[in-house]
Structure formats: structure tokens, C-alpha cells
Amino acid sequence: MAETVWSTDTGEAVYRSRDPVRNLRLRVHLQRITSSNFLHYQPAAELGKDLIDLATFRPQPTASGHRPEEDEEEEIVIGWQEKLFSQFEVDLYQNETACQSPLDYQYRQEILKLENSGGKKNRRIFTYTDSDRYTNLEEHCQRMTTAASEVPSFLVERMANVRRRRQDRRGMEGGILKSRIVTWEPSEEFVRNNHVINTPLQTMHIMADLGPYKKLGYKKYEHVLCTLKVDSNGVITVKPDFTGLKGPYRIETEGEKQELWKYTIDNVSPHAQPEEEERERRVFKDLYGRHKEYLSSLVGTDFEMTVPGALRLFVNGEVVSAQGYEYDNLYVHFFVELPTAHWSSPAFQQLSGVTQTCTTKSLAMDKVAHFSYPFTFEAFFLHEDESSDALPEWPVLYCEVLSLDFWQRYRVEGYGAVVLPATPGSHTLTVSTWRPVELGTVAELRRFFIGGSLELEDLSYVRIPGSFKGERLSRFGLRTETTGTVTFRLHCLQQSRAFMESSSLQKRMRSVLDRLEGFSQQSSIHNVLEAFRRARRRMQEARESLPQDLVSPSGTLVS
């Protein structure tokens, strides 16, 4: 006989099912390994030989009417949350004084019915359901040392049996929440109790009583064969995994007489009928088809293209954070300025925004306010003027950082500006800010006590104002001081017909502006050729209207 291959992987496996968990069925086979077990396989392996059947040498039935082999091997099919009583529970609940809870009395009634109907169907294999007061200490008790002889203390065992439960309570519609959604000053106990998401679980343990023959019903001989956990999302956790094609699991008992047991766990849940599977397949196909049609109706069938020579700029941005400012409770006012030449935006487009007020948090040596405020906008660039050799201007993002205190006093903390990236992709930009200041102590006292300070009338003065027409801009006499920084995260998308042109014989242009300039050159050449055709057509019409005697008959005039 070949050597038995044991399965040593006792880790848990996770499954997901959309079917009701009540349909779950497991077949558990338990057998004690003895020398006679191996001999019983010999006749089947050597059929056709003149051998004596080993059944002759098997032990005879005992006085109780059961052979020892039947007690050493058991196979049973168990359903989800099906209660199978152990011999210890049968002996315990037969005594009415041991019953303390309604569940104990219910178990007592069930055990009495089983005794009247001929006894329970299981011998060594039994279960602990989600309602039972049982906790696997090996799973919940964390060892403090690496010693194999470490035993959990009495307090650890009692605390492991305290099971956390969370009822799925759904509030009434329109009801008022009694608890606060945000706790501004959490205590250490609050953080310790709420930092873990506690998902409601239903647990079931499949156990085995591996005590000696006719000495069942002792807690010290109980061993966990399999643990099943199911949550409300249909996630099923099995530890250890189903046997399948792997070898059986093994258990070695401790004590004076060590014994070796093997067991297998198989999923024998009933399969759906072909008609039910086909009906479910049609339902899901119809559902997915309707969802696909809904998404298609949102997207549309026509892909929106830009006009030739135009660039569409789409920006998904985020005001990430601000740090390094004097006062707390910050908020940011920002807007995008489009250059007057070549740039435009839809009429409904909003190019400005204001973040929420955010309290700063100490991070290293700085106080940081995390906004995570999203914004989006789009703009169009149309390159038409070829006479100008200057590079086209790009949109500019301006920001103004302000603080607001408890008395509704606001202060300007800084101004800043940054040019939007000219390349598509994700960009993280840090904008340094400054603010105008006044000399003297009175200005600082006014800023501290009543708020308010010098402000810019035009925020575009941070760079070059749009109303400026000269060659040089002087800021002489403006006193400023450097303040903090604002971090932006921008995801830029660019769309243009120029991106559709690709040729292996031509080198890739350096930027989209080069491609747009090529479109303008092609348009200029097209305009010249069209003007030449119109002039030639007018010349031919003029010749046809001339008298014939003015035209040379000898053909000297050749068009």
C-alpha cells in the first residue's frame, strides 16, 4: 500500500457566494489510524491470489453490540448552524439543575426527544453553533512567549469567551442621530474601541471528541476539526480548507496513550438544477444588458471631437493641503484666469471656488490643513494668428489663503499663483504664498484683535495684472512677507485632432503647440491655393467675354 499523504496546510480559505448560506452542506469523515486499518486494504490490492480474507481476523462484536471499528470511524453530513450534541452536553443537560438560560432548556428538550426516539445519530463528531457559549482559545488567545508549554491564564480564558456582537440596527427614515458623526476630541478609550471595523459574523465549529473508547464526554478530549465564519456580505471563511484533492488532515492526541486520527472535510452542498441555472443566467444577462444600455445612454453614441486646430484642456484638480501659516481654521479661495488671446471656456463653466474651513494638524514642525477639495474645469485653445512669433500664454491658477476664527474674524494669510502644466498627466504643484504687510505695531495689533489687514484689490496683481499695458511693472514700495505653501494636485487631459496624426516616416513633434502650428500653416497654404483658383477663374471668364477679333487667329496667344 502507498504511504498516506497528509495535508499540512491548515490555513483558512475565503469564499464568496451569492446563494443563501442555509444551503451549505459539509461531509466530515473521521477515522482513527491503527495497524489494522492498513491491513484491511491488502485484500483489495491483491485480488485474484489465494489469500485468506482478513475479515476472519477482525475483532468480534463486543457485549454492547457495537464493534470497536465502528467507534473509531464516523462519517456525517452537517448543515449550516445544525446542532449536533456531544456526549458531554447530553450528560449535562439531562440534569435540569444545570440549565440556566432559555437556550439550555431548549437543548434539554431536544436531548430528551432524541433519547426517546432512539438516541443521537452522531458519536464523536458534534458542533457548536453561533448561539453556543464557546470560543476557540487557540484562535483568540495570543501567546506571550514562544514556549510550547504556555497555558492561558484564567482571565485570558474568560475574556476570550466575551464575544463582541453588533446588531444590524437601521435607523428610521427621517430620524435624528443620537450620536455625533464626528468626534472632535476623541479619548484614548474611544480610539481603542473604534479603530477596528467590526463586521457581524456568524460562527460555527465542527468538533470531535477523541477520548478513549467508552470514555467520551470529557472536555479535555475535544478538538476543533473545522471553523466556519459567514458575514452579511456572503463571505465564507473555512479553516482549514476543504480537503478536495489534498490529503486528509491529521490530529495527534496527547496523554499517556497517544493516538493518531485523520479526517476529511468535503463540500457536498446540493447543486442547482439546470433549469434554475438557465433562469438565473437569463436574469443576470438581462440585468447586465439593461445596465450597459443605461451607461451607453449616459455616454452617448457620438464621440465629441474638437474643431481642427483647437486644443481642449480638461483639468481634474484638488486642493490638497496648506501649511506654514500663522493662524488656524484656514480656507482657500482660488480661480483660473484664461489668457485673453486664443483661449475660451463654455458659458456654464465655473472657473473659481472656495474650500471648506479646515483645522490644522501638527505634522513634524508644521501645522498642516488637509482640504482634499476637488474641482474641475475645461478650456479651449484655438491657434489662428501666424503673424505673432511669441509663445502662446497658458492659463494661470491663483489662490488666496484666509483664516477664520471663532468670532468670525478673517485674515488674509497669503497670495500665490502658478501656471498650469502644459503637458498632460498627473502633477503635484506646491505654491509659495506671500502677503502685504504694514509697518508698525498698530497694524499687528489690529490684525490680532479685530482681524483684517492689507488686501489686494486685484488678485491678478500676484503676477501681471490683466489691465497692465506697459512694458515694465514696478512693485517698488510694496512691503510683503513670505508665508506658507499650498499644495495642488492636477490631472490634466488634452484632446486635439493633432494627436490623431502619426507617421512612422516623420518624427514626433515636440509638443501639441507644434502640431497646432502645423494645422495653421496647412490652413494658410489652403487659403493661398483657394485665392489662386478664384483669380484664375476670373481671368478665364474675362477672356471668354472679349471679342473674337482681339484674339490672335494664328494661335500666338496661348493661355
Swiss-Prot record:
**What job does this protein perform?**
Component of the tectonic-like complex, a complex localized at the transition zone of primary cilia and acting as a barrier that prevents diffusion of transmembrane proteins between the cilia and plasma membranes. Involved in centrosome migration to the apical cell surface during early ciliogenesis. Required for ciliary structure and function, including a role in regulating length and appropriate number through modulating centrosome duplication. Required for cell branching morphology.
Q: Which Pfam families match?
A: B9-C2
Its subunit composition reads: Part of the tectonic-like complex (also named B9 complex). Interacts with TMEM107. Interacts with TCTN3, AHI1, TCTN1, TCTN2, CC2D2A. Interacts with FLNA. Interacts with TMEM67. Interacts with B9D1 and B9D2.
What is the protein's species of origin?
A: Homo sapiens (Human)
Could you tell me where this protein is found in the cell?
A: Cytoplasm, Cytoskeleton, Cilium basal body; Cytoplasm, Cytoskeleton, Microtubule organizing center, Centrosome
Related disease?
Meckel syndrome 1: A disorder characterized by a combination of renal cysts and variably associated features including developmental anomalies of the central nervous system (typically encephalocele), hepatic ductal dysplasia and cysts, and polydactyly. Bardet-Biedl syndrome 13: A syndrome characterized by usually severe pigmentary retinopathy, early-onset obesity, polydactyly, hypogenitalism, renal malformation and intellectual disability. Secondary features include diabetes mellitus, hypertension and congenital heart disease. Bardet-Biedl syndrome inheritance is autosomal recessive, but three mutated alleles (two at one locus, and a third at a second locus) may be required for clinical manifestation of some forms of the disease.
* Gene Ontology cellular component annotations, sorted alphabetically: centriole; centrosome; ciliary basal body; cytoplasm; cytosol; membrane; MKS complex; nucleolus
Q: What is this protein called?
A: Tectonic-like complex member MKS1
Q: What is its main location?
A: cytoplasm
**One GO-annotated biological process of the protein:** regulation of canonical Wnt signaling pathway
The record's gene field reads MKS1
